[in-house]
């Protein structure tokens, strides 16, 4: 009887873990499903050389129309001001994905706010365009693989 109970508990735990894994996978961002966060021209691409051996880990856009939009739906997990990066907005999308928006003049959102894909979240300044980075499980990934084709 004890062995049968242990087997049932183990099977139940396995089922729960499988459900969690399936739910997490369902939240993963699919290739070419994200909206472009800026209408600006891409000035620097992911992986291109920035200086010396340093490479860009995201995309740098020209100022465009100065509007910054959420690439995907999610929750704002951070809004902070940094000396060299302006107002930084970070959105968590689930499935291990976050998007980072830098060089903003301001944010229209605060930590904890839910945002929809394409929703206006801030404005860039007139001198620097938007810097956009996408990360999966803490590692920078090429946004071009996840953004819709223009």
Model-derived features with residue positions:
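Activation segment
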Residues: 82, 106-107
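Active-site loop architecture of trypsin-fold serine endopeptidases
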Residues: 124-132
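Extended non-globular C-terminal regions
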Residues: 99-102, 110
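Conserved ATPase active-site switch/coordination loops adjacent to the nucleotide-binding site
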Residues: 85, 111, 128
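Extracytoplasmic/periplasmic cell wall- or extracellular glycan-interacting regions that localize
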Residues: 1-86, 90-92, 100, 116, ...
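Acidic, glycine-anchored pre-beta loop/turn
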Residues: 107-119, 138
């Amino acid at each position: 009887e004890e062995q049968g109970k242990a087997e049932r508990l183990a099977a139940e735990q396995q089922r729960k873990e499988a459900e969690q894994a399936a739910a997490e996978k369902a939240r993963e961002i699919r290739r070419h499903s994200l909206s472009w966060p800026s209408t600006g021209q891409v000035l620097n691409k992911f992986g291109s050389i920035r200086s010396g051996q340093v490479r860009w880990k995201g995309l740098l856009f020209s100022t465009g129309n100065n509007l910054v939009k959420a690439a995907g739906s999610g929750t704002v997990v951070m809004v902070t001001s940094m000396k060299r990066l302006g107002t930084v907005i970070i959105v968590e999308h689930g499935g291990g994905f976050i998007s980072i928006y830098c060089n903003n003049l301001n944010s229209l959102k605060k930590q904890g706010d839910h945002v929809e894909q394409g929703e206006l979240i801030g404005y860039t300044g007139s001198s620097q365009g938007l810097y956009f980075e996408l990360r999966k499980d803490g590692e920078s990934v090429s946004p071009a693989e996840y953004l819709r084709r223009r």
